[in-house]
A protein has these predicted regions:
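Non-catalytic, conserved peripheral segments adjacent to functional cores
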Residues: 1-86, 104-146
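Beta-rich strand-turn-strand
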Residues: 86-92, 97-105
């Protein structure tokens, strides 16, 4: 899949994918996405699906997380993180936490992500929900200076 801001592809669907570094997480699908500089992809939300994201150290992505879970102990909490930027780490995004990303780099940014549900276009089975990119305010995507 390709759009004005980049591309997305499914790399693999798995029947069993248990990683010792991710307790309680069984990978069912591996995805790869590229984003052009300055592009924002937001907000996605999943009812049951957990995402695990990896951004290569050579890239720099601003990730915004919003807790919109019903009955959450941290309702409407917002968190901004930088992934990549010389560091290697995984980000685990639980169900019900809206998430989006902005490529802060000068070249195409890459995300490899694992999910514990396989994509389905069937409206009764899909895990793909959306909120507007500016749901938390357009300024959430501004780069903090200082």
């Amino acid at each position: 899949f390709t759009d004005d801001g980049g591309s997305f592809m499914e790399l693999a669907r798995l029947d069993r994918g248990v990683a010792s570094a991710l307790p309680g997480f069984e990978c069912r699908q591996v995805n790869y996405s590229e984003m052009d500089p300055g592009v924002i992809k937001a907000f996605h939300i999943h009812r049951r699906q957990t995402d695990v994201w990896f951004v290569p150290p050579d890239d720099k992505m601003l990730v915004v997380l919003l807790d919109v879970r019903a009955g959450s102990k941290s309702p409407n909490a917002q968190r901004r993180l930088i992934l990549g930027d010389g560091h290697s780490r995984l980000l685990r995004i639980p169900p019900g936490v809206a998430h989006g990303v902005k490529n802060l780099g000068r070249s195409r940014g890459r995300i490899i992500y694992l999910v514990d549900f396989q994509f389905s276009a069937d409206p009764d089975q899909t895990e793909e929900g959306r909120l507007p990119w500016d749901f938390a305010g357009a300024d959430v995507w501004d780069v903090a200076r200082g």
